[in-house]
Every structure is written in structure tokens, then in C-alpha cells.
């Protein structure tokens, strides 16, 4: 039944796209997508030997606007994988999607960006330095195979929904249930953004629990500064009842000049009944960002991790993060 519903939704998108394509065409246009994240890092104290240059991640792709609201995009993600030695890099297809926008409605299908923490990541604004909270602590994936829709009811209210496989873009499965998500974004006044999201990731095994995710966010961008905070709850990690994770993140930045930003962030991750105590932590990152022309950014930053495991020592790292992209 679920497969039929998904197929019907995909066919509806395809039929609407066909109708749009038959209308008077606009001049097509495209652009390359190139983003490279790298760094030099060095630890202090117990991490003194953890130092070196690192090519963290590269995104290579192309986006093409066909006209009449129709757009296609393909992006390759080249980065680290937990499945192989840390020195190796694996290439994945992160996005292979087609989207159609008409009026206040936008439909997207294929290997698409998810809606779980997309807004928080954009507001944080320093993805090449560190992932946003939910991505950093593996509350969900940034892309997956499925369909999504968003509708702008008013200038201050937009809602979105998504149905995807639920395993992310690195593990494209088809037999382990689906993930459903629903979100709403409010912008009641200029500069102020609020968002709430709920997601349910089905388990194909009746003896195991469904995963659930609740995310809330509020942020304000003013002239030359921004500040935001988010609270996240992730229930039944690994489809195990009681394996709940929760935490919050606070981040902000100040524009010191046209080419210089000052930024800081505090994360706090906890687990129910301390089941994840070995990885629970609070963490701080702070630093500067310098823009060297249009395509290059350099960001020296200091990081401190404070584990919640009893008798565990704090860890300190210094980074020089680098970005190239257009």
C-alpha cells in the first residue's frame, strides 16, 4: 500500500512537469556547483599528535533551469566514510533531483535534500567549518531518495512535507520502511525565523521501534549579526526503545568588517538514562572567518569538547578551515 502511494505521488509530479514543459519555454540556463572543504588541525594535550592537513569534503555538480519553474540538479559528494579506512575517500551521488515550482507550490523528486535540518544549517552558515547539530550527532541525513513538497501560505508561513526511504543518500534501501516528515516555518517579522519539524522513520521489523525526530528552531538576523538556537529530540536510535538522544545548540556571528566575521557556537548532547554516555558531550567552537575574494574563505577556530563520561578529560583542538566554491 505504501509503495502504491509513493508511486502515485511520483506519477503526479511527472504529469505536472510534462504539462509545464509543453507550455511556452523560457531560455534555459545552468551553473556549475563546486565546493571544497579542507583544513589544517592540531590537537593539544592528549591530542597533541593529532595534527595534519585534511581534505574533508568536496561537492561537484551542475544545476540547470529549464524554464517555467522546472529545474534539474545533480551533485557528487566526495568525502570520508565510516565503512573504510579514514585515509580513503568515497564518492556518492548526493543529489539527482528534478523540481518544479509553480506559484506558491514547489515539488521535488529523486535523490533530494531533506527538510529536517536544512534551515538550521543555512542559518548557522559555516558548514565547511562544522556540521549543524543534527548532522554532527547523526540525528538524520541531509539527503535521501524520495519526494518533497512545500507550500507558501503567506509571506510569514511556509509548510513542507517529505516522504523518503529513511536511510540517507549513502545507503539507498527499498525494503526497510519509509520516513515521513512534516515541518512549518514562520517569519512573523523581518529577520526573525521560527521552525518546527516532526519526522517518523518506520521500522520494517514489528519487534523494533520506529525512530522519531522532533526539531525546533528560532533565530534572528539583524544588521551585521545573527543569533539562533535549536532544540532536538531523537527517539529510539537504532530502532531500540529508550535509546533517546536530545540536546540543544546556540550559535551566533558578528560581521566585524566586509571581509571578516566573528562566530561562536555551543552544543550540548545528552542521552536518556545515559545510554550514550561515552559520546554525550558539550562542545564549544569559536573563531574568525576571512573572505579572500569571491570564492575563498579561511577560518581559524578553536574547539573544546567536554565529555560527560565520568573521569573523561576535556579535549582541545585548533583548526584553520578553508573553503573554495562557486
Model-derived features: positions:
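Outer membrane beta-barrel
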Residues: 23-166, 176-178, 185-194, 263
